[in-house]
């Protein structure tokens, strides 16, 4: 399961009971910090993180209750600085050191009319700016980490 939490819940000393509750009930598989502009298009500028969790089995919960602490394990952690738009929700594109937008060629299907006036669909090669979004790369890194680690405790 994945949850989006305000960073204040993850770092506020007065809310440590929430963090303890999570650690007594689930493995934190991943923690990904998101930039302030992540939810800017929803008029929210709260710093947030995504936590990927896996609930403990009943046996694991009993073990945590008996020992008073969760087991030790590795956690995937990442920080995404860019999500494809700025604080106002405007698109942000990858740029060269000189400030020019980086373009890539791609094929698009375009609906048009032929000489007879019939509606047809054609493939057209176009150049488009690349959205500056790190989340696909973070996702790929997480998938690679999972494949490499294949944690023994991960219940798929």
What are these regions (language model features)?
Residues 2-156:
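A conserved structural/catalytic subdomain of Rossmann-like adenosyl-cofactor enzymes
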């Amino acid at each position: 399961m994945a949850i989006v939490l305000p960073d204040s819940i993850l770092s506020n000393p007065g809310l440590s009971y929430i963090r303890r509750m999570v650690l007594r009930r689930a493995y934190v598989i991943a923690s990904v910090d998101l930039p302030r502009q992540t939810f800017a298009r929803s008029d929210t500028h709260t710093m947030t993180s995504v936590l990927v969790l896996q609930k403990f089995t009943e046996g694991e919960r009993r073990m945590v209750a008996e020992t008073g602490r969760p087991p030790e394990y590795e956690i995937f952690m990442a920080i995404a600085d860019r999500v494809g738009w700025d604080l106002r929700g405007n698109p942000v594109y990858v740029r060269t050191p000189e400030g020019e937008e980086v373009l890539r060629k791609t094929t698009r299907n375009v609906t048009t009319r032929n000489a007879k006036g019939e509606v047809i669909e054609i493939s057209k090669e176009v150049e488009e700016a690349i959205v500056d979004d790190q989340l696909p790369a973070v996702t790929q890194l997480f998938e690679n980490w999972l494949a490499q680690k294949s944690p023994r405790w991960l219940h798929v």
